[in-house]
């Protein structure tokens, strides 16, 4: 069955992927086969996985989670699904804003 998965790398970063054989793929990551990102950050640990009916859905979930913040990924890993909607909103208050002057 197809899977979307999250690995925690030795440097504390996360890697998100999808595969049809989860056990084999985690072994490959730890052997340095495939993704260069994880090859340089071994060992890796599987911290989250979700099974999907087909690989297209697993790949779509992978792409979605890759776009998430670290905090949102960690909420998913913890199973804190109630926190996900709040973490989806970008906090623009920490960025300086520039407005066009009002036309008179």
Where are these regions (language model features)?
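Short arginine-rich
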Residues: 63-76
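GIY-YIG nuclease catalytic motif and its immediate N-terminal context
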Residues: 1-60, 81-104
């Amino acid at each position: 069955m197809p899977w979307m998965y999250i690995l925690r790398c030795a440097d504390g970063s996360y890697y998100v992927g999808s595969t049809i054989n989860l056990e084999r793929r985690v072994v490959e990551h730890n052997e340095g086969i495939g993704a260069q990102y994880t090859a340089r950050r071994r060992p890796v640990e599987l911290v989250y996985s979700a099974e999907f009916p087909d690989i297209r859905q697993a790949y779509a979930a992978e792409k979605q989670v890759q776009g998430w913040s670290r905090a949102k990924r960690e909420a998913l890993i913890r199973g804190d699904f109630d926190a996900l909607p709040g973490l989806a909103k970008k906090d623009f208050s920490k960025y300086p804003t520039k407005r066009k002057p009002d036309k008179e």
